Amino acid sequence: MVMSRIVGIDLGTTNSLVATVDSGIPLVIADAEGQRLTPSVVHFPAPAADPVVGHAANRVRVLKPAETVYSAKRFIGRRGSEISQEEMLVTYPVKGAATGAVTIDIHGREYAPEEISAEVLKKLKRDAEAFIGEPVTRAVITVPAYFNDAQRNATKTAGELAGFTVERIVNEPTAAALAYGLDRLRERSRIAVYDLGCGTFDLSVLELNDGVFHVLSTNGNTRLGGDDLDKRIVDFLVEKIKAAGGPDLTDKSEIRNPKSEMLPMLSRIREAAEQAKIKLSTETAVEVPLPFLASTFSFTYRLTRQELEDLTRDIIARTRVHCLRSLADAKLEPKDLDQVILVGGQTRMPLVRRFVAELFACAELEEPSGEIRRDSDYHKPKGPRLNTSQNPDEAVALGAAIQAEILSGGFKNMLLLDVTPLSLGIETFGGLMNVIIPRNSTIPVKAGEVFTTAVDNQRSMLIHVLQGERERASDNWSLGRFTLDFESAPKGTPRVGVQFEIDANGILHVLARDLKTAKQKVVKIKSAVDVDDAEVQKMVDESVEHAFEDLRARQWIETALRARQTIAAARKGLVECVGEIDADYRTKVEQALKTVENLVADGEAATQPGDAAKLKAALTALDEVTQPLADLMMDKAMEAQLRKRGLVK
């Protein structure tokens, strides 16, 4: 049986593309109108009517804003509690459902964001089938590198709803590097991929060596992109319109009313703002015409590139911290890079290109693209080259097509090694996180450890899966919990193997197995980090800021656990050997025990971790005092074993 061709898809916030490899050449497939970019826009004309997708939907967005969905990628795989800021960017009703998921209400029906994305994917599927001339059922779909597990799963679901078997979920910057790397397979080079799209930003650092693409690190923000620039321009124009005597469109609460007269006006302003932003990448000033914005009001404004840059400079600057973190994770400096690749339509903006050139101390460009200031201090003759040779809108889709070809058996001299951006582990006794897969581990990856019980007669073990960079479980994010049952046994006897596996799509599977009975549970983690990217970055920052405090906490918790075990063993020995030790020795043991018990109790009562060094010293003293007791207990245990075997009477 001949397998169908695998296509590569860039499912974007504003535009989506489908690509394939034909006769060894990756290319983007055009639709029936000859357009290679398909707007990620879906219009629902009536409750029972088929949705309109792409350019046709985009054309009616201004007229029917409450029934036309765009930028659905911003909501995919997210909880309703996270959407308050983003819902101000759209003109259709978005809300959090009772289950916590985000839904979009059109004509009285609630749609999940993945259902909207599925309609876009169906359109791409039809376009690909028309071009190839055969059914297309397999796809590689790209996502932002910093998408969490829930967002990746939702993207995969969207592909399946569209009729695809999703062969692989690939990070967008990694796919772009594949597209740029085709003609340099034998070079060894380090590349930074600066990917600023309409809804997301990623900075990935990769090493290309003899056809192997190894992702060294990735960092980003899935809530930062060109949409934020559009909103800033819209807010600016709204104030200008109000000052010119036009309608007051500053009441954001009206946006939530699908029947509001503001929606068509705001939709027109948003479209005009987006077009002006695009034109200002090649022009220094543009007219923003809004004729008959209201029945008796028309408006025109001449927007300059300088005004645009002043309005949006702080948004672009927010990408800086992600770039520096990614470089730090890769243990590199800008001078260690060979190239910086620009990906995403927003990187056409001259301000972005100047910002990137300055941040990475790029060497001079051969062409004045982006109006890079030549001979400025931040340009180094031996710095990395700012590579703009690929179409930034198409690079990701082309890379996805190349990955699809690799999976099909083509391009055998290429290999893609991606990474996971955050550490994964489980909670252990005492409330600590035990890391099983560290952050920036190359995926796919599989790792595991063996754990045991800390309580006598325990009949089950709760596996609490965590993600984050802190020492204490409570400071990290909970991905899920499940229980593995086993036979009752003394503490330390059961042995439970826990294995984490991150597949090539970046999706986590957790296996827990009782090594005695082989009883096991396998859980697919469907909801990863249910927080926004500000919280993701807060986690990384706090892991550095609180590193010393976390280390103290871990040292205290581990020492306190050992202290409790030692106390229990010593108390047991005093009971079992009550007739074989004198009163003076018992008093010495009791005093040493009391010292340790008091230190543990004081540490538990305090708001800060106790003094681990002082507790360790007290434990050492207790160990020395109880050594004769331990020897006596060992002798009694050996005698019992010999008597059991009939070797002594």
Regions found by a protein language model. Give the residues of each.
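Trp/Tyr-centric glycan-recognition "aromatic platform" motifs on solvent-exposed beta-strand/loop surfaces
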Residues: 100-102
